[in-house]
Amino acid sequence: MSLSYSNVLNINKKNYNGVTIEEKALSGKINIRGKSSDKEFMKNIGSVLNLVLPIEPNVRIFNNNISIMWLGPNEWLVETPENEKDEIISLLESKLNPEKTAITDVSFNKTVLRLEGEKVFILLSKFLVANLEKILETNFSVAQTIFIKIPILFIRNNTDKEEISLDLHLNRSHAKYVYDLLVDGSKNLNI
């Protein structure tokens, strides 16, 4: 029997004082751990994902359907279309040495909120000490931090010439709480 799951909030894209918020459609999320200094590991990952794992902090790389985020020196998050996740996990398991690596399906415990608009960083600054606008100034960069006592992965989706777009990867159990805070915080963005 296969488990199934759905979005947590089931909300459509809504605009709140210049910031749109939506819960992204479900996607596959695979946590990979291994040594970036292990050439065989890096080669095998590359052959399965058709991408080279980023080894620089706060970097995201992507191709058609797959996105890889650097989480730490020996840890990455791979985001895939939901319908391709199981096949990718199977291929990774067949190529990687299980004694030196770990592959974990984390799709069921994470959801993604997308924030877009010119006031996104103003809204987030109400809840963070860190200056996300500075931290995420590079196109398609990532940052992990604690957001109102909740660990969140922030991903910048836009280039300099595009509207600000951030994805917030967070635990499903915190989604409603964070969403309500963001909606409430958006009521006065004239800082």
Stretches found by the model and what they are:
Residues 1-191:
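Basic, glycine/lysine-rich polyanion-binding surfaces/domains
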